[in-house]
Amino acid sequence: MNFINLRNIQKGRTAFMGLAILWVIAFHYSFLQSEISKMGYLGVDIFILLSSFGLCFSLNRNNNYKDFIIRRLKRIIPTWWMLITIMFVINIILQRNHPHSLFQIFTYYSGLGWWFFHNEPFGIYYYEWYIPTLLTFYFFAPFLFRLNIKKLYLLLIASVFCTIYLDYYSIEPRLSLSYQRIPVFIYGVILYKMYTCEVCNKTLKSFLCLSSFAGAILFFVALMCGIGGCAVIVGFMFAMPLFLSLCYKLLYGKLGKVLSFIGTLTLELYLLHIYNLPLVAVMRCVGNRNISIIITTILLIVVSYVVSIVVNKAVEKLNTIGYKGL
């Protein structure tokens, strides 16, 4: 029963986010071509679960819907818009696909292009799916927060079955990147509900342990059988409390501090690394792919830190002159 400690997951949440983004980068850049790096897409599931888990603490302090949405948008929109604008200009220069009309620009900058126009030439690219998905989840988070744990479990079960159905029949397969993460986001809210009654409810804690071990078994069986897709994500989702609790021991000392620092830059790092241009530029100079990946990641961390400072200063400046929007 002591294998899983939700309090440690909360304490190490920022460091876990740092570990997750490094895992995602290793996946996208094919670092070392190892089996661990090939599973790095699961780092996104860690993001989603820890995001919903953390959002509940924010909602517990202030559950006003408008205030919550504005806080989330202020965190994401400035950085997101700045970086996709830079890529927008680069795509024009390199004569790549890019939005042309005002309507296309609107769907691109709002994220609606991912949901409704992802098959169009001007739609959001598949590797840009994460932010539109996360923003959509944020809009539903306050409603999930108000549900009790029984209703959340019913919703979780329904979402898992819907995901399996959509995945099995390959319905909108490109959007599977988003809809496969719906159960993960719901499960993060459930973990928060368990966290708040962790000491007084032994039944919930026992169920959490059993579901985590069952999820770990499903995860490894799915990997060994080459099933992939939904089975791997669902298995990993239930196994995450166990996985993160075991990883907590890695967070002691300097490593934990480094990962926590990186964890504060996950938004910037994610947006910067997905375009591959930095890696291509470094590889032309260095040659060796794995060394280039390490150098590129370090450079991305530095640039992400600079971007975060610039954006925060800009937002603060806008607030001081009476800007009350995003």
Where does each model-flagged region fall?
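Membrane-cytosol interface segments of multi-pass membrane proteins
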Residues: 1-162, 202-206, 210, 253-255, ...
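Surface-exposed cleft-lining segments at the edges of enzyme active sites
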Residues: 121-130, 165-177, 227
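Loop-centered beta-sheet repeat module
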Residues: 142, 153-194
